[in-house]
Amino acid sequence: MNIINYYFLFLVIVLSFKSNGQVPKVYTNISLDRGNAVATVKGKEYRESNNGAGFHLQDLIGNPQGTQTGVKFNFGPKVPSGKVYFGLINPTDGKYPMPVYFRRTAKISASVTEINLIQLRGKYDMSGWEKSNGGFLGYRVMGPEGQLLYDGRLSFKYENDMFRVPPSIIEGPTINQLTDNSVVISMKLNKPGPIVLNVNDTKYESKGKTTIDFKISSLSPNTEYKYSLEGVVTRNYAFKTNLKKGDRTPFVFAYASDSRAGQGGGERNLYGANYYVMQRIVAYSKARNVAFLQFTGDMINGYLAEKQEMNLQYANWKRSLEPYSSSFPVYVAMGNHEALVTYFSNPETAEEFGIDRFPFETESAEAVFATNFSNPVSELKSEDGAAYDPDPKTKDFPPYDETVFSYVYGNAAVVVLNSNYWYAYALNRYPGTSGNIHAYIMDNQLEWFKDELKKYESDKDIDHVFVTLHTPFFPNGGHVTDDMWYNGKNWPRPIVAGEKVEKGIIERRDELLDAMINQSSKVRAVLTGDEHNYAKTKITEAMPRYPENWERPKLKLTRTIYQLNNGSAGAPYYAKEKTPWSDFATNFSTQNVVVLINIDGKSANIEVRNPFTEELVDALELAK
């Protein structure tokens, strides 16, 4: 893309922003100057700034074009040099075929490279592409500083002595929203084109789209279905529907969080995601025959200002789930690193803070998260209509979309919360623009949560409920200064349209605890992350939960549950810190682990394993 086209694209974005350029009423002291946000707080001006390397997903896909000898890519001006690893994928070589990388690489020069596919003939044609006149290619883009930027896929055809890149599945297929009688099979293409899906001898077709969600219904519970995708070569897959609601047949599911880029080089940082650890967690989960994996936040580095850069990091994370995500669902939730931010900075003071991007319907962290995943959708729409809503007649808050929901498998339910909704980076230090703090569940979400727990409490088919959100109720190492503790301070809370909400963070924590422990008999555990370690915390009436100077009412707990924190999926580790409840936090570990939750009728227990060594790190009976 030349500079004129880039300028035109920039102009379109700015004009689009300006045409929707009303500052949401929930914010304060923000104005727009030629499409850019400006915050003026206490006489000091902070202008919108960027934060990120500027890599975009569409650029890294590379606009592949066929040539006489292979496929040519253009990765854009942000990748002027580097190299590309590439290899064929044989779709018939096992259930979960992966790229087998060739011994040579392709050099990137002036942002352009060509993968020579002719050299993959003869003894190097391990996929039979010469016979079928086409095949599948995996490629990895390495930037000028040696960092892996993108892990790509494409299809190619060879006709009339010329290679051609047809509409190709570049992401997926993935199993989503699986129930006992339906499924959503999702995929993304490099360009619009026809896709034919066969499920149980029934054909489904999509045309003219790049993001496709095939919704398949009228399935039978606990049944394996084979499915295939027609293309250059037919690819075969399989999934198994859920147990019927109320079925008490034993099953296991997995839990983890915090897989943003780690240290150690290589795949530990596939631009924003720890591919190395995630791939092992998902492979081990599949080997243990889990029904599903719940992953709750900080998938990626995030904290970015550009949607296309966010999409790139999400794409890399989703690649780490493949090819196993073609056979079982991975449910995801937001963490603070899923933040998509409008940054404000003052160059004279080097101060910086940020808010959730707007327009909320298209640019917010919540909206972009929802476009990248296919989660269930709840009845909770937003915080509009809450007591602090500045204008009940207009939409003033971001959509919850697919960031807050619940789902059922057999006799168990999982309730997913968003503790980073409408998140304003550094709000406690820069409150002038308004926003929400890290870890705070706002009013409408709290009421929805209570209603969900009541629903499952009265449901005779549900024996076990698991609650998951990114931020611990009781942090133990890494986030003692925030999460739902803030070093024992209750004053942190959201600010809406310049006004602080009524309840502080510890008060809101107690309302959540009351709903889970005192008002529910079925919640077995709360699954959290944020802290990059594993720890099991026994939440009981005997556990110290308040600062020494606490003068407000104290919540009495009527039973015991456990907080299972597993933020060990590859982000840089945190060690254990001293807290009032330290004696109640046990089996602390900085090893990478996956929590396996075994359900067998009325009983439930956990098994915590290192997915690399398979060593048992912890075990606990949750219900007899």
Tell where the protein language model's regions lie, with residue ranges:
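Solvent-exposed loop/turn segments at secondary-structure junctions
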Residues: 259-262, 299-302, 336-340, 420-423, ...
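Loop/turn elements at helix/coil->beta-strand transitions in domains of secreted/extracellular proteins
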Residues: 249-252, 288-293, 325-331, 409-414, ...
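Bacterial Sec-dependent N-terminal signal peptides
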Residues: 1-23, 516
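Short beta-strand segments
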Residues: 255-257, 294-296, 333-334, 416-418, ...
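Divalent metal-dependent phosphoesterase catalytic cores across multiple superfamilies
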Residues: 23-401, 503-522, 533-534, 591
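Extended active-site neighborhood of metal-dependent phosphoesterases/phosphodiesterases
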Residues: 174, 224-238, 308, 312-459, ...
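Short acidic, glycine-rich surface-loop motifs adjacent to enzyme active sites
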Residues: 295-300, 456-481
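Short, solvent-exposed loop/turn elements at domain surfaces
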Residues: 194-196, 261-266, 340, 416, ...
